[in-house]
């Protein structure tokens, strides 16, 4: 199963970064390139342990839906969402927030299993792993910019 790890250093407290990362409206704002929007479950505000959200987005020209649930939660330090329905055979996204002085190291670890057997494995190697890394990295940069520059 492919895994990507993206680390983003943010000059803001971990609690602020943690809450921004859980904000459903902000998630949609920071993924606007894929026309992402929350269509079911928690569709606004901060998602909590046990809650789920369904996002609809356009990836590779195809409109898709992905539902994930928060399965682990440690306030200001970590939350984990797992796909419960969507295009992947499985997907898990671990969001970690490590305080460093007065700043935060935000670490996103995403692991997935693509569908379609060998074809999914080939897609992972040819383009999907790179696409996922870019998608998560760009969202991290957007969260960093908001955390460091906007009052929310």
Where are these regions (language model features)?
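Hydrophobic ligand-binding cavity/cleft-lining segments
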Residues: 1-43, 48
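Short strand-connecting beta-turns/loops that link adjacent beta-strands
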Residues: 13, 75-76, 100-103
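Beta-strand elements of well-folded, non-transmembrane domains
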Residues: 10-12, 59-61, 72, 87, ...
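Generic structural detector for well-ordered beta-strands
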Residues: 5-11, 56, 69, 96-98, ...
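Beta-strand/loop substructures that line and gate deep hydrophobic ligand-binding cavities in soluble
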Residues: 80-134
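Glycine-rich portal/gate segments that line the openings of hydrophobic small-molecule binding cavities
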Residues: 38-85, 105, 138-151
């Amino acid at each position: 199963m492919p895994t990507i790890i993206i680390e983003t250093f943010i000059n803001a407290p971990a609690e602020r970064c943690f809450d921004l990362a859980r904000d459903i409206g902000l998630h949609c704002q920071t993924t606007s390139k894929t026309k992402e929007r929350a269509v079911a479950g928690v569709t606004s505000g901060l998602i909590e342990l046990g809650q789920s959200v369904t996002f609809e987005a356009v990836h590779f020209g195809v409109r898709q839906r992905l539902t994930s649930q928060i399965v682990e939660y440690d306030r200001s330090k970590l939350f984990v969402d797992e796909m419960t329905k969507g295009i992947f055979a499985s997907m898990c996204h671990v969001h970690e927030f490590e305080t460093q002085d007065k700043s935060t190291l935000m670490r996103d670890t995403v692991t997935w299993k693509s569908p379609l057997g060998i074809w999914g494995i080939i897609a992972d190697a040819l383009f999907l792993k790179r696409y996922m890394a870019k998608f998560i990295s760009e969202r991290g940069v957007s969260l960093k910019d908001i955390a460091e520059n906007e009052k929310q």
